[in-house]
């Protein structure tokens, strides 16, 4: 989908932390790109085959909390199961009483020989400098992770 977004995501300088800005023509696309940006800090997602599916359902009463839980869940999957996500993510974001994400992540077990190591291990998600906003015809999600 075409829109005026500058890029899918980019990184900013931050001491002992990494600032990530993820973009999307839709809020769903921005959340997908936020996941890919997180993974790319550790390994090359384009080398991950979508061999296995992991279903994730999360909710929160605001978008900032939803973003925090989304990234935190991805960190948990990598830390506990060494599940490397591919760029294939099916994501449905909506709102009933609360905001929710129902997603299917495709990937496979992390293999340093196959997926590489890009130099960083993400330790935790933070609320520091978090921002979610619509800019003209695209969305920007900004968040900071501890490395």
From Swiss-Prot:
Keywords: Calcium, Metal-binding, tRNA processing. Belongs to the archease family. It holds the Pfam family Archease. InterPro entries: Archease, Archease_arc, Archease_dom, Archease_dom_sf. Activates the tRNA-splicing ligase complex by facilitating the enzymatic turnover of catalytic subunit RtcB. Acts by promoting the guanylylation of RtcB, a key intermediate step in tRNA ligation. Can also alter the NTP specificity of RtcB such that ATP, dGTP or ITP is used efficiently. This is Protein archease. The keyword tRNA processing applies. Transmembrane segments: none annotated. PANTHER family: ARCHEASE (PTHR12682), PROTEIN ARCHEASE (PTHR12682:SF11). Ca(2+) binds at residues 17, 146-147. One of its GO terms (biological process) is tRNA splicing, via endonucleolytic cleavage and ligation. GO terms for molecular function: calcium ion binding. The keyword tRNA processing applies.
């Amino acid at each position: 989908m075409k829109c005026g977004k500058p890029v899918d995501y980019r990184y900013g300088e931050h001491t002992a932390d990494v600032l990530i800005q993820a973009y999307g023509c839709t809020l769903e696309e921005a959340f997908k790109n936020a996941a890919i940006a997180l993974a790319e800090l550790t390994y090359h997602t384009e080398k991950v085959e979508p061999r296995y599916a992991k279903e994730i359902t999360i909710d929160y009463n605001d978008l900032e909390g939803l973003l925090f839980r989304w990234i935190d869940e991805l960190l948990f999957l990598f830390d506990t199961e060494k599940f490397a996500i591919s760029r294939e993510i099916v994501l449905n974001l909506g709102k009933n009483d609360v905001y929710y994400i129902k997603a299917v992540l495709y990937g496979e077990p992390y293999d340093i020989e196959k997926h590489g190591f890009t130099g960083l291990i993400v330790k935790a998600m933070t609320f520091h400098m978090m921002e979610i906003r619509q800019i003209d015809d695209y969305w920007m999600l900004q968040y900071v992770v501890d490395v």
